[in-house]
Amino acid sequence: MAEQTQLAPAAFHLPDLVAIQRNSFRWFLEEGLIEELESFSPITDYTGKLELHFLGKQYKLKRPKYDVDEAKRRDGTYSVQMYVPTRLINKETGEIKEQEVFIGDLPLMTDRGTFIINGAERVIVNQIVRSPGVYYKSERDKNGRLTHNASLIPNRGAWLKFETDKNGLVWVRIDKTRKLSAQVLLKALGLSDNEIYDKLRHPEYYQKTIDKEGQFSEDEALMELYRKLRPGEPPTVSGGQQLLESRFFDPKRYDLGRVGRYKLNKKLGLNVADTVRTLTSEDILAAIDYLINLELDLGGCEVDDIDHLGNRRVRSVGELLQNQVRVGLNRLERIIRERMTVSDSDSLSPASLVNPKPLVAAIKEFFGSSQLSQFMDQTNPLAELTHKRRLSALGPGGLTRERAGFAVRDIHPSHYGRICPIETPEGPNAGLIGSLATHARVNDYGFIETPFWRVEEGRVRKDLAPVYMTADQEDDLRVAPGDVATDDAGYILGTTIPVRYRQDFTTTTPERVDYVALSPVQIISVATSLIPFLEHDDANRALMGSNMQRQAVPLLRPERPLVGTGLEPQAARDSGMVITSPVDGTISYVDATHIEVTADTGEKYGYALQKYQRSNQDTCLNQRPIVFEGDRVQRGQVIADGSATEKGELALGQNILVAYMPWEGYNYEDAILISERLVYDDVYTSIHIEKFEIEARQTKLGPEEITREIPNVGEDALRQLDENGIIRVGAWVESGDILVGKVTPKGESDQPPEEKLLRAIFGEKARDVRDNSLRVPNGEKGRVVDVRLFTREQGDELPPGANMVVRVYVAQKRKIQVGDKMAGRHGNKGIISRILPCEDMPYLPDGTPLDIVLNPLGVPSRMNVGQVFECMLGWAGQLLDARFKVTPFDEMYGAEASRLTVNAKLSEAREQTGQPWVFSDDEPGKIQVYDGRTGEPFDRPVTVGRAYMLKLVHLVDDKIHARSTGPYSLVTQQPLGGKAQQGGQRFGEMEVWALEAYGAAYILQELLTVKSDDMQGRNEALNAIVKGKAIPRPGTPESFKVLMRELQSLCLDIAVYKASTEDYEEDKEVDLMADVNQRRTPSRPTYESMSVGDIDDDDD
């Protein structure tokens, strides 16, 4: 391909896209951990004679035991050991013992922003939560009167809520308990009436509360406080004092955090030092004063919008980990105190006091089972990148799906340039999980900032550094979008400019604009910014497009898009899938697995490439060098491609020839018709690597053995196994083939009667083992690419009870087939309905057959017209041998810029190729197409172009499934559901109605009995089918018996009787006490021999 053409200047260079993860973890190592270690030091015992100090600033980390690759291979955790110098002081003797103590393992972040936990790569998702601070809210009571309340929310500790009522009284609630008068709290804090009146701007409002309640002295107030918080206990002044102290003034119990203090000072106009993290009486008075002003509606005060991003902050890895470390250290503190008390003070040493277990457990729990620690989505590089930039409102301390209303999920004006308004899941999590916008960054307080250019008297100052602002700072400024037109000197063109001001969209003159957004892609996320012509798509479809790009399977031969947005190289680079040169230099050595760069200064840097590794999603991770020996490289240049990248650019799909036309109904309802070329030429072929694992365990009857001596298996089935019974690398396996031979010892009871008989006759002791081999599951086939053996002797850590673990990796090439799901980048998705031979596909005037035929009805109602622009510009690109980068939102280059650009490029292509049919002025973008079967032209010209289509991870191979007999549920005895359980197809209530409507009585009877949960009936039916006899009459479904048992458990005497004569006989139809079968195995039907007399042929 020729060099790419820029149709718009590239967006301002994006910042490092994974910085949010790395910076947060760096902060944890440099500050967060030290902060925690110092906050809980010193620990004194209950008598006060022993003190244990932690010197947090001098903590050390020892080198990791394994590197990243080794940790993955051994199922280990990539972590470092933490050591802290401690000092134990005995105050009685003055003796000081110093020692370095091990306090636990800390998982370490890899340079890609992930963690390796038990061999799996995981990501800690950023959580977006309500910021600590004070929030004012107005509510209407049932009489329609407006009342106000204020909530003081700390980082941790008790909530304090102030409210006014219809009589104009001020009340306080502590931690949502009973309300008490504000006067009680203020007096209990030790404030005198004069001090209170001095601080309030409208003391007369507060006076009403005193008139109603009467005066309280400080002691009375403390007693009243105790009475309200601890009803039923005798109140004391000291008890009230202690209660108040521990609730709001003890730094261990109450913490506003740096952010809470900053927000409180800002909202209430205070000047309290930011080291004071607990409440002060000044805070409480100022909060009440603000509430009274709000109630009197005197201006200068306003209620808060809790969904505004100035009131929500991001907690990233570092902070989440810090909170978890705090939990662990608190448990540790308790243990240390107990040990100090119990042990003899002379023999004590810091090492004997500190037990690393509680801290290790807390950290393990966080990484292993927290809602925010997620198995990384590694389907392709974009999925990985997006996962690290995800913002979740769920998780500990956040919202739950059920409780979250519409307001929280909605797009808020303050999201502009901070959270992407488009990328969010469909379904119950919509709006609760978002993605960070491309240029957004998180500041020290956890608020999201976004950059702007300063505007001075109508001129955009791009020569100055961009200014980063939080949502709060931006509120009172007039900010124009990033696609306003400017002249060469930077002056804004036009007389009325659209701006955002105080969360509203208005217009103003260029002179009054304060700031301009940095770039048009600033408001959207990385995945969304990869959609060309995004501005022509409906938001719902753009959402699907963003989400489906993350599900694209890496293909065998990746191909860059002809029409991109210019952000593909950076997305690939920051995902960590490609290798970049660290220095300016020369390539001194390169082969398929290794690259060496020699810097100009003489140092050598070596890189081992990942070859055909399995990703978390079973896709294939493979790196290929794209440089040659002797090439000059610059710092940051891509030297090796990863999966789904080409020449250092993201390449998720393929450019293929597409036409929008109906074809024999095969593209009805979004179905897709494709050409055989896509199968034969491996255009959409992907490699999938699956892991199969088996462990040999220690059982009661002896150890399980991995061996090729398997009972009742022919030599043919063992031909691919080595002498240990393990498949050899390179073998081709299909479903049912043995991968690892394993035998399990079995006891006497396990033997079937025929074996007992043989042993009784011949007295020969058959080998008492059962075949328990690992076999290839149904519907799978492929080539064995790797076998790994783990044993205790080699020093591997195995699960308890296992002697050996064998892992077999099987790779399969999956070509595209009917039932696979494909999609474009604009939310246009569909299932392949038919694969046509090339000669039957419609063809162009020059004889080129189409690759894919899409339904034109998929465009107008869905309003994703971007796909039409893309396919036409792609067509021009192919003919001109050029690639285009189209920045989204291109109206700054003139009205209808997209259409004019595409038409201009198509005309150019017509001129260059000399083919008039390429672009017709009468029917722009449409071409006469011929039917491949008859050679006749179709009635009307159709839209033809090159579209970038992806193959998604929802492959039909993983979904198709059949069951003849299989496992049954224990309680209902009905077949299980789902492919993984070898389940059946659920025939639900509505499906039964459909059969009832047709009166299909026998099909219905079978469905509800022998095919489902009539245990005796299904065994008999199976026997009858095997022997070729008539199927006997069905019995009673087990679920009916369960219902009867439940009714009987409610003491209802219920039974079902046969009606043989007018006067009913006591002949039970369903006998719950009769055992169906003494020797039945509940999970599978048994073959029982039946005499001919058992089957009544007349019953038919």
UniProtKB/Swiss-Prot annotation:
**Annotated NCBIfam families:** PRK00405.1, rpoB
Disulfide bond positions: none
- Stretches the record annotates as Disordered: 1064-1100
Keywords, A to Z, come to: DNA-directed RNA polymerase, Nucleotidyltransferase, Transcription, Transferase
| EC numbers | 2.7.7.6
GO BP terms: namely:
DNA-templated transcription
The protein depicted here goes by the name DNA-directed RNA polymerase subunit beta
Q: Enzyme group, top EC level?
A: transferase
Q: Looking at the record's lineage, which domain of life comes first?
A: Bacteria
Gene expressing this chain: rpoB
Where along the chain is composition biased (Polar residues)? 1079-1089
Q: Which GO molecular function annotations are given, in alphabetical order?
A: DNA binding; DNA-directed RNA polymerase activity; ribonucleoside binding
- Quaternary structure and interacting proteins, as annotated: In cyanobacteria the RNAP catalytic core is composed of 2 alpha, 1 beta, 1 beta', 1 gamma and 1 omega subunit. When a sigma factor is associated with the core the holoenzyme is formed, which can initiate transcription.
Give TM regions.
Answer: none
Role description: DNA-dependent RNA polymerase catalyzes the transcription of DNA into RNA using the four ribonucleoside triphosphates as substrates.
Keyword Kinase assigned = no
Spell out the family assignment given in the record's similarity comment: Belongs to the RNA polymerase beta chain family.
CC terms in the record's Gene Ontology section:
DNA-directed RNA polymerase complex
Per its record, the protein catalyses:
RNA(n) + a ribonucleoside 5'-triphosphate = RNA(n+1) + diphosphate
The record ties this protein, via SUPFAM superfamilies, to: beta and beta-prime subunits of DNA dependent RNA-polymerase
